[in-house]
Regions:
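Active-site environment of non-heme Fe oxygenases that use a 2-His-1-carboxylate facial triad
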Residues: 1-25, 30-32, 36-42, 78, ...
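Mid-sequence acidic-hydrophobic segments that form the walls
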Residues: 66-70, 124-127
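Short secondary-structure capping/junction motifs at helix and strand boundaries
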Residues: 68-78
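Generic structural signal for well-ordered secondary structure
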Residues: 38, 53-56
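Short amphipathic C-terminal alpha-helix that caps PH/PH-like domains
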Residues: 56-67, 209
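N-terminal accessory beta-strand-rich subdomains and adjacent acidic, glycine-rich linkers
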Residues: 43-51, 58
Length: 279
């Protein structure tokens, strides 16, 4: 398989050929492929046949199933979300992925108890070359001092739950920004807007985290037929503002959330519609 694996510092892109990956779906190499890319902050699957494939969504879903179980949150649309920003829309109640305002660095669903492990973005069109900004956890941690990391590891932060979820409480329960997983590696679950902090020290720690993350961005510009898979535990992602006189930008994506272990959600996972619930 034409795979280029890099360390988490984003010096290179990881590129996987779609045809060869598709052929591996039922092969004995499936687990090897998954484990090989597990801890990368992102990778690209190239040459997805969007022009010739009349079953784009079904094939996209099958490819994402290589990494785990596609999921959705019960309050946020379909399992495959169509992302086509409107540059003229800026209402706070409109999800950021559907308007033209700057999308600051964040991890996906950080206000949920178990956020998805991956976000897969299939590029349908991108005439304006609008990229996805990615900042890698390893680079971030290298540039933060130990005391700041300790503060970010405290259960001292409540993250804003966006209005479109219709949740009665505006913020999640107290959680850390950074935590260690079962493998001893750091996970990162952050949304910088609307964070409530226990102390001023914790607020300053978040400001340091944001500064370092913003200073170490890699922009990934996807072409039609490329799937960008972002490791939601190992990186933050965002997008610059989209300006256009047109009602809709030329950038159109399909998005799927992926979980490595849906059983961990317990009774908050509905197998019939592949949906998680709660915060």
């Amino acid at each position: 398989m034409n795979t280029f694996i890099t360390s988490g510092n984003l010096n290179k892109e990881n590129l996987i050929n779609y045809t060869e990956l598709k052929n591996s779906i039922y092969s004995s190499n499936k687990r090897i492929i998954i484990e090989e890319i597990l801890n990368q902050s992102f990778f690209l699957i190239d040459e997805f046949p969007i022009d010739k494939n009349s079953e784009i969504d079904e094939t996209f879903l099958s490819i994402c199933s290589l990494l785990g179980s596609p999921i959705k949150h019960e309050k946020e649309g379909d399992i495959i979300m169509k992302i086509k920003p409107n540059p003229l829309e800026s209402k706070a109640s409109t999800p950021a992925y559907n308007n033209g305002v700057k999308f600051d660095l964040h991890s996906e669903l950080p206000y949920v108890h178990l956020p998805p492990d991956y976000i897969a973005l299939l590029c349908i069109s991108n005439e304006q070359n609008i990229g996805t900004n990615i900042s890698n956890i390893d680079t971030i941690l290298e540039k933060l001092d130990g005391s700041t990391i300790d503060l970010l590891s405290d259960k001292a932060y409540k993250v804003l739950i966006p209005p479109h979820f219709g949740h009665t409480d505006s913020h999640s329960e107290c959680r850390p920004m950074i935590s260690r997983n079962a493998n001893g590696m750091y996970d990162l679950h952050v949304r910088f807007d609307g964070i409530l902090c226990d102390t001023n020290e914790h607020r300053v720690a978040v400001e340091k985290l944001k500064k370092v993350a913003d200073e170490n961005i890699k922009e990934i510009i996807t072409k039609p037929g490329q799937i960008l898979v972002i490791n939601n535990r190992r990186s933050l992602h965002g997008r610059r503002a989209i300006t256009s006189d047109a009602r809709y930008s030329s950038r159109e994506l399909r998005r799927i959330y992926i979980s490595r272990d849906v059983q961990a959600y317990g009774d908050k996972y509905n197998d019939k519609n592949m949906a998680i619930s709660g915060f």
